[in-house]
Amino acid sequence: MEHPWIPNSHKAILDEMLEAIGVSSVDDLYRDIPPTILLSPEEWDSLPIGEGRPLSEAEVLARINDILSRNKYFTDPPPFVGGGVWPRYVPSVVKALITRGEFLTAYTPYQAEISQGLMQALFEYQSLVAELLEMEVVNASLYDWSSAVGEAMLMARRVTRRNRVLVPETMNPLHLETATTYAYGGGIRVEKVRVDRETGFIDLEDLESRLSQGDTAALYMEYPSSYTGVIDENVEAAGEAVHKAGGLFILGVEPVSMAILKPPGRLGADIAVGDGQPLGLGLNYGGPYLGVFAVRWDGRLVRQMPGRLIGMTVDAEGRRAFAMILQTREQHIRRAKATSNITTNEALMAIAAAVYLSLLGPQGLREVAEASWYMSHYAAKRLSELRGVEAPLLEGEFIMDFTVRLPMDAGVARRRLLEKGVLAGIPLGGFSFFSDNDMLLTVTEAHTRRHVDLLVNLLDSVLGG
């Protein structure tokens, strides 16, 4: 019955644990699990173990390399896929520094007296992001963009004591799905606002109509949109409208583009959220990424912020010191009444972002943003030269992401490009007002003109040009 892969599977140990929790058998413990998918203890011995013999280190490494060789890598060209995370060049120094033993942990530095280096690095992250976004208070990280939106909605409800949040109908569906899950638990209704079909801008008339109902806790928008790339020119007017209605303005931003766009602090945002992935984190399945969360200087907002805050102070001997501050908001003190349930977090990713921002500086970050703008516009221009292709589909200004209409099903085109070794686009069929022929394409500073020309030529052949 004992199995080398299953801890505590020896009968004597199992019996002792079952007795301690007041359960008569393993079957009784798992009675809520459908029997068709349950592996009984009698079947444990049938689980295969490797090669039936111990393997040497060299053999194990060979097996792992064989498995890894089945993966497909997209480095030349990088993927033309964004939608909330983007292909970016990650300087080697970022990984070199965050893999140092002093930093390599995701755990919260509760013991300030032995964590000064880690805390200072997190304080620097907060300071750098505050400067980039022109927001006064930044926390030490949330999980990702989606969780940051969800936490912002919950925070808006606590501050305003209202339970409705408005979002544009073209809000990133992945962000919306997670945020709606957060909102449901907090008793918040999420309502979509119409977006202009030609420009991709939020419809101010529809927004005003919904705000007139008087129960809006917040309006959430993205600048630029992470699922259309559009830089909404109505963003300031929308923020003023929600403030006039007594709600908060939550703005989701892509951090690199803030080097050339007006930051949320100057757009009237009460809360700014986003993902730190473009700041030196690269792409890796679902993460780990970095939820950015910032607020303007307002006691009501700061006291209701989720997540850790690192502050600078002086110790008993007058020396500069760093510590976690305003901890009475947090679950290790307030338990169920805490402003969030995040403890162990993305601190290591925050340090990576701090390294990236420090390395590039304001001018370097601006150059990355300008290169992304240039390359995405070059790609849209080249694609528009193909017969039957409309690029960009929306008239609003864009950066990195842009929508394209093809003369064929976008999903089919994507599969055929993949067969040619290029991962390109997110089909938009079924999303908002887009058709099956519409696709979201992404081009950043990681792409070159050669990469774009390759994409255009391959797409031309896929379209039968």
From Swiss-Prot:
<dbReference type="Pfam" id="PF02347">
    <property type="entry name" value="GDC-P"/>
</dbReference>
<dbReference type="GO" id="GO:0019464">
    <property type="term" value="P:glycine decarboxylation via glycine cleavage system"/>
</dbReference>
<dbReference type="GO" id="GO:0004375">
    <property type="term" value="F:glycine dehydrogenase (decarboxylating) activity"/>
</dbReference>
<dbReference type="InterPro" id="IPR049315">
    <property type="entry name" value="GDC-P_N"/>
</dbReference>
<protein>
    <recommendedName>
        <fullName>Probable glycine dehydrogenase (decarboxylating) subunit 1</fullName>
        <ecNumber>1.4.4.2</ecNumber>
    </recommendedName>
</protein>
<dbReference type="InterPro" id="IPR023010">
    <property type="entry name" value="GcvPA"/>
</dbReference>
<dbReference type="InterPro" id="IPR015421">
    <property type="entry name" value="PyrdxlP-dep_Trfase_major"/>
</dbReference>
<keyword id="KW-0560">Oxidoreductase</keyword>
<dbReference type="InterPro" id="IPR020581">
    <property type="entry name" value="GDC_P"/>
</dbReference>
<dbReference type="InterPro" id="IPR015422">
    <property type="entry name" value="PyrdxlP-dep_Trfase_small"/>
</dbReference>
<comment type="function">
    <text>The glycine cleavage system catalyzes the degradation of glycine. The P protein binds the alpha-amino group of glycine through its pyridoxal phosphate cofactor; CO(2) is released and the remaining methylamine moiety is then transferred to the lipoamide cofactor of the H protein.</text>
</comment>
<comment type="similarity">
    <text>Belongs to the GcvP family. N-terminal subunit subfamily.</text>
</comment>
<comment type="subunit">
    <text>The glycine cleavage system is composed of four proteins: P, T, L and H. In this organism, the P 'protein' is a heterodimer of two subunits.</text>
</comment>
<dbReference type="GO" id="GO:0009116">
    <property type="term" value="P:nucleoside metabolic process"/>
</dbReference>
<dbReference type="InterPro" id="IPR015424">
    <property type="entry name" value="PyrdxlP-dep_Trfase"/>
</dbReference>
